[in-house]
Amino acid sequence: MKVLVIIDVQNDFLINGSLEVPDGNDVIEPINEIIKNYALVVATKDWHPLDHVSFASNHQGKKIGDVVKVNNLDQILWPVHCVQESKGSDFPTTLNIKAINKIIYKGTNSQIDSYSGFNDNGKIRSTGLSDYLKTKNVTSIDYVG
């Protein structure tokens, strides 16, 4: 089975978001076009607690863009973004969320970041994505976002 994995298409990464990606909104329409070609669609969400280690505001004297060591890993400091249950963590209303079969939450541990949809940055804790894809007998993965 083939799966489409939508990576972190969330309000905080779009226009006027706290961690805006230039032209980030431009991915939404193409995703909505191709999503209908997949029987299985998974979306990842950055889903941070307010005390997350990646937020510059949680490191006294540090600013956005600084790099600090946390648990022997380099951590880039970001603005507060994709806080659990916030509008910034939501999918944009223009994304066809009805086609999403499963949401994988990442970055949920306040002490370690998770850039990957599969594991945290230290590869200590899985997000469950790999196990989920195995249960669905996935043989091919297409990524967008």
Feature roles, as predicted:
Residues 1-4:
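Extreme N-terminal starter segment of soluble prokaryotic enzymes
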Residues 7-13:
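Short polar catalytic/cofactor-binding loops
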Residues 9, 19-20, 65:
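Bulky hydrophobic/aromatic packing residues
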Residues 14-19, 29-33:
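Active-site neighborhood of HAD-like aspartate-dependent phosphohydrolases
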Residues 15-23, 117-121:
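Short glycine-enriched, charge-decorated loop/helix-capping segments at active-site entrances
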Residues 20-24, 58-61:
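Glycine-rich, phosphate-binding/catalytic loops in enzymes
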Residues 29-140:
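Active-site alpha/beta core segments
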